[in-house]
Regions:
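Short, acidic/polar
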Residues: 38-52, 106-122, 167-173, 206
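Conserved, mostly hydrophobic/aromatic
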Residues: 25, 45, 52, 60, ...
Length: 310
C-alpha cells in the first residue's frame, strides 16, 4: 500500500462508522463505450481494479446500471474476496433502457430489485453504502424512495444510507428521518456535467450550499464528474499554469482544488487507465497556496473555490 498522506486537510474521512482515505475510485469508466457492455479488454479492467487496492484506495463507487451489471461483475472478479477495509458504495434510483439511455427507477420495487442486483453481482450479503439517486422527473415522492432504503437497511441488506443529486432541503428532510453518511452531487472546478447532468434540477445546480451544509455536519461529500468532462484545462485555463508550477497535470490540480475546498470532500475520479489512476492518487500530495487558488478561481467573489481549507 502506498503512503496515505494528504497535503490538504485530513487523510481520511468518516462515513458513519467507516473510515477511508479521502480519494476513492469511481467505476463508471469500467464498462464499454457509453457505459454499456463489456470493455475492450476485461483483463486490463481487472488489473486496474487490483491496482486500486495496491495504491491504498479503499472506497469504490459503483452502480448495477453501469454496463448494466458490468462494473459490479468486474469488481467482484478482480477483488473478491474483498480486503476487510475496502468500502463498496452503490447507487439506486436509475436504470438503463435498451437504447442505452438513462432513466429513473425510484419506485420501492425498482429500488429493491436494484439492491438485489448489486448484492448478487458484487457477491455481498450487505452493501456498505447505498446512495439514493433522486431524479426529480421520476414522479416518485422522495420520502417514499427513502423509506424503501430504510426498510432494506433494517433487513440487513444496507449498512449506511447516502443521497445523490439532491438539494439542501432534501438532505435536511432525509436527516429528519434517518442518518445520512454521504451526499454525491456534481461538483468540479469547471462546473461541467455529463450524461447524467440532465437528471439534476435547479436546487442541485447550486452545489456550494449542499457542500457547505455537509461540511458543517460532518457528512462526506462525493463530487461526481470531479474532473468535469473532456479537457479540464480548457474548462479552466489557469489549471495548466498552476500545474506547471507544481510539476503536475491539470487534472491533478483539479483534484487538489477539490481536496482544498472542504475536509468533507471525497473525490471519486474514474478512469480505465492505470497511469491516470496513479496520477489521480498522487494528486493528494499537491499543496495549493493562496496564489494558486486565486488563479484557479479567477478571483471571483463567491466562487466556490474561494472558500478553501488548509
Amino acid at each position: 500500500m502506498d503512503d496515505v498522506s494528504f497535503a490538504h486537510g485530513p487523510a481520511t474521512i468518516r462515513l458513519g462508522d467507516i473510515e477511508v482515505p479521502r480519494i476513492g475510485y469511481g467505476a463508471m469508466r469500467l464498462p464499454g463505450k457509453d457505459v454499456w457492455g463489456e470493455p475492450d479488454d476485461p483483463a486490463a479492467a481487472r488489473r486496474l481494479l487490483r491496482r486500486v487496492i495496491e495504491l491504498g484506495i479503499r472506497f469504490i463507487d459503483t452502480a448495477w446500471y453501469y454496463g448494466p451489471l458490468v462494473s459490479n461483475r468486474l469488481i467482484a472478479e478482480a477483488l473478491h474476496p474483498y480486503p476487510n477495509d475496502l468500502v463498496i458504495a452503490t447507487k439506486l434510483g436509475g436504470k438503463r433502457l435498451p437504447d442505452k439511455s438513462w432513466a429513473p427507477a425510484a419506485r420501492p420495487d425498482e429500488l429493491r430489485q436494484g439492491c438485489e442486483h448489486d448484492l448478487k453481482t458484487l457477491r455481498l450479503e450487505r452493501i456498505d453504502v447505498v446512495h439514493l439517486r433522486h431524479i426529480a422527473s421520476s414522479g416518485v415522492p422522495f420520502g417514499e424512495s427513502l423509506d424503501a432504503l430504510v426498510a432494506m437497511r433494517q433487513e440487513g441488506k444496507i449498512r449506511h444510507i447516502a443521497l445523490s443529486t439532491v438539494s439542501r432541503p432534501e438532505v435536511e428532510l432525509a436527516l429528519a428521518r434517518t442518518p445520512i453518511v454521504a451526499v454525491q452531487n456534481m461538483f468540479n472546478v469547471g462546473g461541467g456535467g455529463g450524461p447524467l447532468a440532465r437528471f439534476t434540477h435547479s436546487e442541485v445546480d447550486r452545489p456550494e450550499s449542499v457542500l457547505d451544509f455537509c461540511t458543517d455536519r460532518g457528512i462526506a461529500y462525493l463530487p461526481f464528474f470531479p474532473l468535469a468532462v473532456g479537457n479540464v484545462a480548457q474548462v479552466r485555463p489557469a489549471l495548466a499554469e498552476v500545474a506547471r508550477k507544481h510539476g503536475a497535470t491539470p487534472a491533478q490540480v483539479a483534484l487538489a482544488w477539490l481536496l482544498a475546498r472542504s475536509p468533507a470532500m471525497l473525490p471519486i475520479p474514474g478512469t480505465s487507465s492505470v497511469a491516470h489512476l496513479d496520477e489521480n492518487w498522487a494528486a493528494r500530495r499537491i499543496r495549493l497556496d493562496s496564489d494558486d487558488l486565486r488563479a484557479i478561481d479567477g478571483g471571483a467573489p463567491g466562487d466556490p473555490g474561494a472558500r478553501t481549507q488548509s
